[in-house]
Amino acid sequence: MHKSLIALAILSTAAHADEGMWMPQQLPQVAKQLKAAGLKLDPANLTKLTEFPMGAIVSLGGCSASFVSPQGLVATNHHCVYGSVAHNSTPERDLLANGFLAHNFGEELPAAPGSRIFVTKAVTDVSKQVVTADVAKLSGKKRSDAIEKNQKSIQAECEKDQGHRCTVSSYYGGLEYYLIKQLEIRDVRLVHAPPAGVGKFGGDTDNWMWPRHTGDYGFYRAYVSKDGKAADFSKDNVPYIPQHYLKLAKEGSKEGDFIMVLGYPGRTNRHRLPSEVAYTFDWSYPTFVKTSAENLAIIADTTKDNKDTALKYASQVASINNYYKNRQGMLDSYAGSDMLQRKTAEHEALKSWINANPARKAEYAGDIELVEKLIAQRDAETKRDYFLSSSKPRLLNTARTLYRLANENTKPDAERKSGFQVRDVPRIKSSVAALVRNYDEKVDQALVINSLSKYAALPAAQRNADFDAIIGIKDGMSKADLQAVLDTMYAGSKLGDAAERTSWIGKTPADFKASNDAFIKAAVAMYESDMKEEAQEEELGGKLQQAYANYMKAKIAFMQSKGQAVYPDANGTLRVTFGQIAGRDHGADGTTWKAFTTVEGVAAKATGVGEFNAPQAQLAAIKAKDFGKYLDPKLKSVPVAYLATLDITGGNSGSAALNAKGEWIGLAFDGILDSIISDWDFNKANTRDIQVDLRYILWNMKHVDHADNLLKEMKAE
């Protein structure tokens, strides 16, 4: 039934081909659109995950990437390797500012703790195994528990094939479930990242903007044991040999060319209810923007006199800035739109369609009403707990994770909570280890006190009584009183020491209960309350999954009846989007946007300082017009970036852009500020994404980075 829903929805498509984040197995159903758009490959080949080109596409667990050589070289965005560059940077060796290039395998650096490369091997519909006939009869927490149990069982069976990570992902609000089987490469090394003056050129000023001149590229390498199996970092490991890797385009791209992007988009919200739209744009995003601005100011103030601390928080600052501007851009677009009115009208039309037929009314009407009530309950609880969630010191949250792990370790693995099974321990260890280079007590205290003071000012009825009692929060406490409470907690803990943190992994609940460490004691005291809250969330989650899945079933049937396309919202799994390279004749700044930018734009923007500090070697090469074979005859220059009519979102960063022949032509790295609201409401006229042109990457590697070894490896020389 589930596969037929997808197939029928696509066969009746009336949507423009540029819209849609298609699952690979859906592509044969849009073969006519793909061919009409200009694809030269057989669309059926794109469904074969272990063949070319899909076999070259990988996930970094938050970004997308691709194999680009037979020796496991992986191309992605600079901002996707940023955390690893920051992790390896010190005041004496500032790789963020100066860039990094390994001239041979021996010079490559371990990526940040927890870094992974995931190669998708199979996607299988397991909907009937997850929501069995027995599960379908359940509701609330019993339903949540049963679904989780089935997911864990399916994943465990899949992971008997050692070296693989298997995940059961939900689609269409829990209507369908697919098993994603991925090779998990655990030894990831940093190979190359350009200087910040290239990879982050324009900084937050140019982020989400056009025209753009950012060289947003970087390289990792995948390593495995000598027998070719996934393994932890070891000097004895060897480069992974992928079955497939991308070939460099033989010809440059031009406006009007077919383009497709293969990657792992994170989240979109196009199937959300009107109440979810209103909640997000009236409260959630505005609150996020306000809080982000405060946090950025706090981090800037507490790190301004300490370069090492600033480096520790560089990746977090970049992330906050990115989402701050993203959310503000969405709010600006929403303010001038009729999106809520249209979503409301569409939802009312759905309900009218359901009520017009007795059979449909019997099947769907109750769940449509219920899902609206459950969403209202969920959103109210999120509002209530907003400041509480950010009022806990990072070391306290670390202690809570470690104590939870200790308790889960007393159970058989199949009975442990997802996230705390044996398969999850390496991730937890990496997270604990990463604190060495992304945590500072002074900064953490400043962030926590800002949130805690807001939380403590709430009426007692809106606060968490258990948390208050454990931490020592009372009505009427001043900021100074709260700071004194925090000072005592931080001073009473040794978890700021890396060795001390690591030592708690594997200890028993009794060890935790016997500890006098302030954060450990607080974690133990909070455990019962945490479990109670989790059970309440699962009770609501089980009800919501049941109602939301039926809502989506109704919506799919309704859209089919109107001849509209139905593709699932992005959920971090492999997708394909296609369109064409194209400018915009109505740019957000009131001008016509050309499809390409060139290196002359870099020189024009370069100031020699801050976000626009282009390397002198690059500026000299531009001035001398030393373009070589990367010259575009029509542009009479080297293209830096280009616009395309592709449907992407966060998570697509680092995705390979391919031409009609499946050749590599660039890397997707950003969207346009006035069109990122397409995460919620696709806008065909405005939506554009930005790719860094492969020719700019190669030209820069040749003339600025002098990465001749990598150019040779990729057969660019």
What are these regions (language model features)?
Residues 1-7:
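Sec-dependent signal peptide recognition
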Residues 2, 12-717:
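Terminal presequence/propeptide segments associated with secretion/organelle targeting
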